[in-house]
Amino acid sequence: MPVTAIVGGQWGDEGKGKVVDMLAQEADYVVRFSGGDNAGHTVINPMGEFKLHIIPSGVFYPGVKCIIGNGVVINPDVFIRERNELISRGVDVKNVFISDRAHLVLPYHILLDGLEEEARGNKSLGTTRRGIGPAFVDKYARMGIRVGDLLLPEYLHERLEYVLECKNQILTKVYDAAPISLDEIYETCLKWGKELAPNIKETTHIIEEAISQDKKIIMEGAQGALLDPDFGTYPYGTSSSPLAAGGCLGIGIGPASVSATLGVFKAYSTRVGGGPMPTELLDKTGDIIRDEAHEYGTTTGRPRRIGWFDAVAGRFSCQINGMTTAIMTRLDIMDILPAISICTAYELNGKIIKYFPANSGELAKCKPVYEEMPGWLCSTKEVRCYDDLPLAAKNYICRIEELIGCQMSAVCIGPSREQTIYK
């Protein structure tokens, strides 16, 4: 089957956007399957640098159809703004479609996200405050408004009336905030419906036909496996599954249709927001890596937390995704380091463990067990053949492959398409 899932192997920000952009030139479809505009993908190509939050990274190829699947929650304002910016920069967006089953991020979701984070105080989860979590809560509480509802004014009004009655009770009585106007939000939704009507499709049928015609489909993941609500650092995670299995649910296909799962790993670890991170570097080395790599969130602008590569977490990520191959990004950032460490195990309560604990409290107590490897202290940015990489760099890649149990099919040594080395 011609479906390839591309997923993040860490806490997000691994470089999936570049990988999708790179592989999309041979694809017929690129489909986003999870998350919302809380995830940011940076793509650098001959047209310039683009920061995408909701539109799939395959949009830069005119022949590729890009679908935002039912598993994504969509803020129409963000989609419209992103679409219009792409158009203004000469990108053809006529092949961008949205599933009518996808749920909406509405103004009250954003408002509640901020109020809930404020109420948590120093126990806040570090959300992006873009309303993603509350939108998924409504989806599973059967209070959500879906994209297709925008095209059915009477049904939309009925749904909004019911939902706002509940939301305004929470806003006024729990948070002492002003209520949301039904008329205002209804008018906003009607405007969105007119604006999005050409993009809204019954996408499961489109994808089913594509599979039957043996078309090449990329399932584009958002965020990373270690943020999964079941297998990640709960509750410090995201609200939808970024795993390959989540891709099947998020676009409407069966697992047998997926022929390959490609995991994307940085050569080191990063994380945004709260939650345990065993290999976090709070010293000068972390600052050096952050500055060299410009590690600041695409969506939030917050400085990312930096750590050494965590092979325990990486192996777990390979397992729960069923990765068939992987790609390492940002190897070039390690060029400046005289020595590099890899976490091969954890020490928990005086015992050495090689598994990823389910409990975030336990994970926070884990001390990394490191294996130190020599750096190479020379630039890899201009290398175009794997054999021409410094021996120490190849040894580093090989050791990570051994530890996570998955082979790297390519290594990225810079942001552009040309800075990708295939093994």
Curated annotation (Swiss-Prot):
Positions annotated to bind Mg(2+): 13, 40
Residues where substrate binds: 298-304
Intrachain S-S bonds: none
Location(s), subcellular: Cytoplasm
Residue numbers annotated as active site: 13, 41
Pfam families membership: Adenylsucc_synt (PF00709)
Assembly and binders: Homodimer.
Protein name: Adenylosuccinate synthetase
